[in-house]
């Protein structure tokens, strides 16, 4: 069920919305009891601005920590209590495959976005997507590919997504800027609406990425946004071929 966001208040000191409903502590315990169900959090966000502020400030953060505790601990290990692009955007990235619209980021690929029940994000896998000169310092978590099989002429497609740690300080970002890589002229990040760089256009996709994905080398394309969210697509090798592929370092 899709619920339209409705802001019925302006969150002022005299706002009636802040009176007569459960306190933040009770709402926190309620959503915690429901195991940080993203459907519940999203529904609460649509009630009014007060609930939306609470969700963005607290509930989505706890959802991320519950869904991927080790990754969240690493992303915050520098001492920051926030992440690039907001907790809500990161929560969406954890559970949503963005797909692609025709004429969008991935040309003629047209696959609807959808929620995924569970996805594994790996820091080890992320190293395979970094240019060799960036692997010493940069940290990137990347998901296993979300498989969309038998896509006609496109074959078996895999969509993957990821998140950089402290992207604003990363070597990848500095290298993209040094190369003068332009932003995509029309499309933005589906998770935070920030501008996107094409790693393919910047010629920064290493061979190791195709081996990690089990994909054809010339079929991989991915983007990184200003907040360090990554999304990409590849054409997967037939299972018999990809099983025998060795990882390129």
Curated annotation (Swiss-Prot):
SUPFAM superfamilies: F-box domain (SSF81383). Residues 16-68 form the F-box domain. It comes from the Eukaryota. InterPro entries: EID1-like (IPR040267), F-box-like_dom_sf (IPR036047). This is EID1-like F-box protein 2. It comes from Arabidopsis thaliana (Mouse-ear cress). The lineage of its organism: Eukaryota, Viridiplantae, Streptophyta, Embryophyta, Tracheophyta. The gene is EDL2.
